[in-house]
Structure formats: C-alpha cells, structure tokens
From Swiss-Prot:
Keywords: Cell inner membrane, Cell membrane, Lipid biosynthesis, Lipid metabolism, Membrane, Phospholipid biosynthesis, Phospholipid metabolism, Transferase, Transmembrane, Transmembrane helix
Compartments where found: Cell inner membrane
Name used for this protein in its record: Glycerol-3-phosphate acyltransferase
Catalytic activity, as annotated: an acyl phosphate + sn-glycerol 3-phosphate = a 1-acyl-sn-glycero-3-phosphate + phosphate
Topology with respect to the bilayer: Multi-pass membrane protein
EC code(s) of this entry: 2.3.1.275
Gene that this sequence comes from: plsY
GO cellular component: plasma membrane
Record bears the keyword Cell membrane: yes
Provenance organism: Chlorobium limicola (strain DSM 245 / NBRC 103803 / 6330)
Record-annotated membrane-spanning stretches: 4-24, 56-76, 94-114, 124-144, 152-172, 191-211
C-alpha cells in the first residue's frame, strides 16, 4: 500500500509543476491565468505567449504524463517501499498518469488552479499506447491546421482515442497489444503498444471529462467568440 501511495504522490507532484505559469512569469512577468481564457495550460499559453512558447509548454506537460506513467512506475517496481501493488500493469500506469493529471489541474504549487489536463493525459497515454496516440496526435494536428482552434482539436482527439483502441482491438483483432522493436545507435529497443480494455474504459471517461472541462470553450465556439491560433505572429 505504501508503494502505491508513493507512486501516486510522486506522480501528483510531477504533474503539479506549473509549466505555463512558470513560462509566463519568466518570459513576460505575468500570470497567464489573468489573461486569455484564464487557464494555465498549453492552450492558453498558445493564446497569450505565442505559438513557440505554447508548443514548448505543451511538450513539457506531455512529458510529465509520460514520466508518471512509465518512469515513476518503473522506479518503484525496482525500489518498492513495501510490497509492489498487485494490480494490472496498464491499470497501475493509468492510476499514476491520472495522479499527474490531477496535479496538473489542481497544482499544489499555484493555489490548486492549473490547466485542463489535456497534454498531461496525452503524455500518459503516449507512454502506454504510443501507436494509437500517434494516430490521435495526427488528428489533433490536422484539426489545428484546418480550424486553428486548439480547443476543438483537443476535444476531437479525446473522443478519437477510445474509438481507435476499439477499432484496432476488435475490428482488426490485434488482441491486447503489439510489441515493437527498433534499432537506435546500434542498440535494439522494444516497446509495448497496449490495447488493454482498461484503456477503452479510461478513454471514454477521459473524453467525457475533456468535454466537461471545455464547456466554456464550447459556449464560445457556439457564439463565435472562441480565439483561433495564428501561427507566426508571436515568438
């Protein structure tokens, strides 16, 4: 039990690193939560700080999710405080990743008011189901390119994930996942692309959560007042 609590606590603290707020303070001396949508995540960083900074914030927030779902779990597997949790591996990684997402949304370092959790959740899923997430990222980027709405891209990508898992698992009959091997700098590396049913259930819950946290964006989209990303105007 102590090991599980440690995994969740460390993952929460990693997720709590307020990337967007730190970028705003360091680059412009502002709290980005007082501008734009009032959010501390990557979407508002794009809007307030420009696309380059917004992209950097988003990538770091993604890395937080990957680290929680992969590295934190792996560390405590090799260095348990007591008995390592007897939990399905994918379910455990999801718990760690979600703890990081909670940290991102309710960051202890910034008054428990952070981002929406999209990028950190994406990072968690990249660590667990990288091939499926490559498809989701493709949908995300294409939607931004065509619509210039980061919020629309985030919501569409969230809905696409459980659908992609279901299609690959049941229509293409890929079972619980596939193992991939790549050669890098003369070394053979392997990674597992999971299609565990826990991912579908989780994906549906996340999609609903993302839609809920974007309800203000949906209202702005319907009223025609949602801001678009314009590439090249900010540095």
């Amino acid at each position: 039990m102590l090991t599980l609590l440690a995994i969740l606590a460390v993952s929460y603290l990693i997720g709590s690193i307020p990337t967007g707020i730190m970028a705003g303070k360091m680059l412009k001396g502002i709290d980005i939560r007082k501008f734009g949508s009032g959010n501390a995540g990557g979407t508002n960083a794009f809007r307030v700080l420009g696309w380059k900074t917004g992209l950097t914030v988003t990538l770091i927030d993604i890395i937080k999710g990957v680290v929680a779902a992969v590295s934190v779990v792996a560390f405590f597997r090799h260095h348990p405080i007591d008995v390592f949790p007897d939990i399905n591996e994918v379910a455990l990684r999801l718990l760690a990743g979600m703890s990081a997402v909670v940290g991102h949304v309710f960051t202890v370092f910034a008054g428990f008011k952070g981002g929406k959790g999209v990028s950190t959740a994406a990072g968690m899923l990249i660590g667990i189901a990288p091939v499926s997430m490559l498809m989701v990222i493709g949908i995300f980027l294409l939607t931004i390119y065509l619509s210039r709405y980061v919020s629309v891209a985030s919501m569409l990508a969230a809905v696409a994930f459980p659908l992609i898992i279901a299609i690959r698992k049941y229509i293409f009959e890929l079972g619980s996942g596939l193992d991939y091997y790549i050669k890098l700098f003369g070394e053979q590396l392997s990674f597992h692309d999971s299609l565990d049913y826990h991912l579908m259930i989780f994906g549906l819950i996340v999609a609903l959560g993302i839609l809920y946290t974007h309800r203000a964006n949906i209202r702005r989209l319907l009223s025609g007042t949602e801001n678009r990303v314009t590439f090249g105007k900010h540095s």
